[in-house]
């Protein structure tokens, strides 16, 4: 289904969940009436889904094979619908290759040892980075001293590398590397046929030729990628390597299609932040290897993660064909700590899942591209929370009442998307705990919420703003919505029975002292850390200030609020609470709450 914008909606409206989630910490304390919505949201048995077109998948490299459960991964590429997956699949666990880029062989030797210590499986020696290069001596040195298998790449300028010298000399160096004991060499498709013919009958038994193609503009259609694979195979390549560029995260689905059905070992990577998933999930979708850098400052291609992140953040060695994929959908999204907490939590309970960053421009096209049971659940952040509600087949009454979804679960039985909102309990409980810990006399009696009768000023009318506003209203607070666009503030205020303000009027709004201020916008988030939605002078009228931003932990708003004498509540408090609610939705297991708090205490 085509979609022209982030807010594009699916044809069928969501219905209320027949069995709403009953969390002892959330729904029991936040009962919003759903009756008002029953006339507008109705059950519909149909839902847009991509049809499947099966084809066999075979992996020829039998080293370290392991069984893969039958799976169907639906992906979309241009106008073509396809299915990744088949029965009786076997696959090769993916390797981690560390690019070594230095201007001298001595530095390269040091970096190969570092790669070994960090946990890489092999190193890519980028010869085109060397300044003073003595081929015979330098190749002998690196092959002898590297503690890991070596892949030699001498990338020319015309394929995105540094080398600008004679082409025949370049190929001679690669042949010499083979003769001296290299494990792999990388040769560009443009010259591969001629090169491979020149070494015919001379290849050592263990030696492999990787034939590579790099596209720095986009990711072609599946038909074009299939044709590219065929051309690479025709050269006599032992291993196929294709690297493309992600214009949209849905482009990665086409690369998963290629690696999943490969007849020979294939490296398929999509460059850029939108392509990060291709590098993390290659073990799941049949990729021969992925690249992990020694540190984040030195990458050989855009979007490469570090070896440390692959192993420690994403638990790369635990990812296999049957691993379920979860992720944080947003734009921006790289700042999110969700992968850190969820992946550690998954590992702590031995849950076979991986949680990744998902930079999504268009939510509808993303959900269509990744509509199989392999992609089991998502967290939604700015700007997709409201659109997410319309993309779900069924929605929890709380999320329906709020008008925003921050958690999506794919139901195992039928693949339908179920929408929830954990922002509400996360933010409200954080603010309540802040008020209770202050000993504020207005917080009694203890049997009621400390928000009762408080004036709560909510900055922002998006998904998080809606969740907090509804939660505060249910707790008996007087809610005021302040937003840059007054019309949006008014719309939310009318929906909950509150008041509306333009954000420009916030500094002059102080009908009483002891109010609660809650920022639910991205103002003050990295990298714009000096932004704040309100003047410091106006903060003296607030007893408590909450900021949903948690990167950085202490924003300018919180710093100035503390200096003004207010209680401050960090977005980390909300983040942890909503995150372990999400964990329970994703896994059906009790959340390791102490672990979540322990992890976030470091940030």
Curated annotation (Swiss-Prot):
This is Bifunctional 3-dehydroquinate dehydratase/shikimate dehydrogenase, chloroplastic. Transmembrane segments: none annotated. Residues 96-313 are annotated as: 3-dehydroquinate dehydratase. The gene is EMB3004. Monomer. Residues 13-22 have a biased composition (Low complexity). Residues 328-558 are annotated as: Shikimate dehydrogenase. Bifunctional dehydroquinate dehydratase-shikimate dehydrogenase enzyme that catalyzes two steps in the chorismate biosynthesis pathway. The active site is at 214 (proton acceptor), 241 (schiff-base intermediate with substrate), 385 (for shikimate dehydrogenase activity), 423 (for shikimate dehydrogenase activity). NADP(+) binds at residues 461, 463-464, 483, 485, 488, 525, 548, 571. It comes from the Eukaryota.
């Amino acid at each position: 289904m085509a979609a022209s914008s982030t807010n594009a909606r699916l044809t069928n409206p969501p219905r209320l969940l027949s069995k709403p989630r009953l969390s002892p910490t959330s729904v029991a304390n936040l009962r919003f009436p759903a009756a008002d919505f029953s006339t507008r949201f109705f059950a519909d048995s149909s839902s847009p889904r991509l049809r499947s077109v099966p084809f066999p998948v075979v992996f020829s490299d039998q080293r370290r094979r392991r069984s893969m459960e039958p799976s169907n991964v639906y992906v979309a590429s241009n106008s073509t619908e396809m299915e990744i997956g088949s029965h009786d699949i076997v696959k090769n666990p993916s390797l981690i290759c560390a690019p070594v880029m230095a201007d001298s062989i001595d530095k390269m030797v040091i970096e190969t040892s570092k790669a070994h210590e960090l946990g890489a499986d092999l190193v890519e020696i980028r010869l085109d980075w060397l300044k003073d290069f003595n081929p015979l001596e330098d190749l002998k040195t690196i092959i002898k001293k590297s503690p890991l298998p070596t892949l030699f790449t001498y990338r020319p300028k015309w394929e995105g590398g540094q080398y600008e010298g004679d082409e025949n000399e370049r190929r001679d160096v690669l042949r010499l590397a083979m003769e001296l004991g290299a494990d792999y060499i990388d040769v560009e498709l443009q010259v591969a046929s001629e090169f491979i013919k020149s070494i015919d009958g001379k290849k050592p038994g263990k030696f492999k030729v990787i034939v590579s193609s790099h596209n720095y503009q986009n990711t072609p259609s599946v038909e074009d990628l299939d044709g590219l694979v065929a051309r690479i195979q025709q050269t006599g390549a032992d291993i196929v390597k294709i690297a493309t560029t992600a214009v949209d995260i849905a482009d990665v689905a086409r690369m998963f299609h290629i690696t999943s059905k490969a007849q020979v070992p294939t490296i398929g990577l999509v460059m850029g932040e939108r392509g990060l998933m291709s590098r993390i999930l290659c073990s799941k979708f049949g990729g021969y290897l992925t690249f992990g850098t020694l540190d984040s400052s030195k990458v050989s291609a855009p979007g490469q993660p570090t070896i440390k992140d692959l192993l420690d953040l994403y638990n790369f060695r635990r990812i296999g064909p049957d691993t379920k994929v979860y992720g944080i959908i947003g734009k921006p999204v790289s700042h999110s700590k969700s992968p850190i907490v969820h992946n550690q939590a998954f590992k702590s309970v031995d849950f076979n899942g991986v949680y990744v960053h998902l930079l999504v421009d268009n939510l509808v096209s993303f959900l269509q591209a990744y509509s199989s049971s392999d992609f089991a659940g998502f967290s939604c952040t700015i700007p997709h929370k409201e659109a997410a509600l319309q993309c779900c087949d069924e929605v929890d009454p709380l999320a329906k009442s709020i008008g925003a979804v921050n958690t999506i679960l794919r139901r195992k039985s039928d693949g339908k998307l179920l929408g929830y909102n954990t922002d509400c309990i996360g933010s409200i409980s954080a603010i309540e705990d802040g008020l209770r810990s202050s000993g504020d006399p207005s917080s009694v009696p203890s049997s009621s919420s400390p928000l009762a009768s408080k004036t709560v000023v909510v900055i922002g009318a998006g998904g998080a703003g809606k969740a907090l506003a509804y939660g505060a209203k249910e707790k008996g607070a007087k809610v005021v919505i302040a937003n840059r666009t007054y019309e949006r503030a008014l719309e939310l205020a009318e929906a909950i029975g509150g008041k509306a303000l333009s954000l420009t009027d916030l500094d002059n709004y102080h009908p009483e002292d002891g109010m609660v201020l809650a920022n639910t916008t991205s103002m003050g988030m990295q990298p714009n850390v000096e932004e704040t939605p309100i003047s410091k002078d106006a903060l003296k009228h607030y007893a408590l200030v909450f900021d949903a931003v948690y990167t950085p932990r202490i924003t300018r708003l919180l710093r100035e609020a503390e200096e003004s004498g207010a209680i401050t509540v960090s977005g980390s408090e909300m983040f942890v609470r909503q995150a372990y609610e999400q964990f329970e939705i994703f896994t059906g297991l009790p959340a390791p709450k102490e672990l979540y708090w322990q992890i976030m205490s470091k940030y």
